[in-house]
Amino acid sequence: MGRTRENKATVIADLKELLSEAQLGMVIDYQGLSVAEITELRNRLRPSGAICKVTKNTLMEQAITGDEAWEPMTNFLKGSSAFVLVKDDVGSAVRAYQSFKKDTKKTEFRGGVMQGQALNEDQVKAIADLPSKEELIGQVAGAINSIATKLAVGVNEVPTSIGRGINDIPNSLGRVMAAMAAKEEGNG
């Protein structure tokens, strides 16, 4: 028995909601994967804020119709399609999928969509090579901390230099006085 019209409308609405929250969508061919393997893929994707949704191409097509951000996905809707929708850590999710693909050798990457642009596998791999959000935050924090440390050392150096200069005045004055006395003795 097929889905009812109301059931299809609910599925389409759910897909639209998932797409509205996603940064990246990948279409993969899941033919040949067992239920256990699809569950394994979902478990690998979950920590990165991604989900794997298996649905009919026609329902996904209805969900993306009219949405410029996702319309390029229509080029990849053929055969047995699973949709990896990434909300949070794009790089981590792509790496999780690549690891799964390498381990199972059963999925085929059809294409990806990000910000209205169709992406091939090499472009998606390039995204995976970018540092994660946490790594970028760490790099920025390290740079800010480095600047603050250098500024503190520089600010601290000014009074230290003034102090050294003030401490040298009596010594310099003593040397000047000794030189003047030696000069007077030499003249006298």
Swiss-Prot record:
- GO process annotations (BP): translation
Q: Which UniProt keywords apply?
A: Ribonucleoprotein, Ribosomal protein, RNA-binding, rRNA-binding
Which CDD domains has this protein been placed in? Ribosomal_L10 (cd05797)
> Is Ribosomal protein given among the entry's keywords?
yes
A single GO cellular-component term from the record reads: large ribosomal subunit
What Pfam families does the record point to? Ribosomal_L10
GO molecular-function terms, A-Z: large ribosomal subunit rRNA binding; structural constituent of ribosome
Task: Report the InterPro entries cross-referenced here.
Answer: Ribosomal_uL10, Ribosomal_uL10-like_sf, Ribosomal_uL10_bac, Ribosomal_uL10_bac_type, Ribosomal_uL10_CS_bac
Quote the subunit structure annotation.
Part of the ribosomal stalk of the 50S ribosomal subunit. The N-terminus interacts with L11 and the large rRNA to form the base of the stalk. The C-terminus forms an elongated spine to which L12 dimers bind in a sequential fashion forming a multimeric L10(L12)X complex.
Q: Which HAMAP family match?
A: Ribosomal_uL10
Similarity-based family: Belongs to the universal ribosomal protein uL10 family.
Q: Could you tell me what this protein does?
A: Forms part of the ribosomal stalk, playing a central role in the interaction of the ribosome with GTP-bound translation factors.
Q: What is this protein called?
A: Large ribosomal subunit protein uL10
Species whose genome carries this gene: Crocosphaera subtropica (strain ATCC 51142 / BH68) (Cyanothece sp. (strain ATCC 51142))
Which gene is the coding source of this polypeptide chain?
rplJ
